[in-house]
Amino acid sequence: MAKQSMKAREVKRVALADKYFAKRAELKAIISDVNASDEERWNAVLKLQTLPRDSSPSRQRNRCRQTGRPHGFLRKFGLSRIKVREAAMRGEIPGLKKASW
């Protein structure tokens, strides 16, 4: 199990990314716009740097909903490989069965 503080940190990062998504997209559009003046682009870079680091979506980490485990995460289920296997063995995931050939 991951520490509660780690789970809370991830929740905070998701909230910040949602809050600043439009602002970040607007600034990045100005930065990548070739028609914008150099000064305008530089100001956009400086403004982007003032935003919180955790507002960047690339700082988010997928974690298991049950345990908070960051590795072995399966997006389809939102769980780690261990919890997916446990749920599959109990028959809690419809349509999922153990491979046999």
Curated annotation (Swiss-Prot):
GO biological process, one term: translation
GO molecular function, one term: structural constituent of ribosome
UniProt KW keywords: Ribonucleoprotein, Ribosomal protein, RNA-binding, rRNA-binding
Entry keyword Protein biosynthesis: no
InterPro entries noted in UniProt: Ribosomal_uS14 (IPR001209), Ribosomal_uS14_bac/plastid (IPR023036), Ribosomal_uS14_CS (IPR018271)
Pfam families: Ribosomal_S14 (PF00253)
Any one Gene Ontology cellular component term annotated for this protein: cytoplasm
UniProt key word Cell inner membrane: no
UniProt cross-references to SUPFAM superfamilies, sorted A to Z: Glucocorticoid receptor-like (DNA-binding domain)
Family indicated by similarity: Belongs to the universal ribosomal protein uS14 family.
Subunit composition and interactions: Part of the 30S ribosomal subunit. Contacts proteins S3 and S10.
HAMAP family attached to this UniProt entry: Ribosomal_uS14_1 (MF_00537)
UniProt cross-references to PANTHER family, sorted A to Z: 30S RIBOSOMAL PROTEIN S14, SMALL RIBOSOMAL SUBUNIT PROTEIN US14M
Chain's role: Binds 16S rRNA, required for the assembly of 30S particles and may also be responsible for determining the conformation of the 16S rRNA at the A site.
Protein's recorded name: Small ribosomal subunit protein uS14
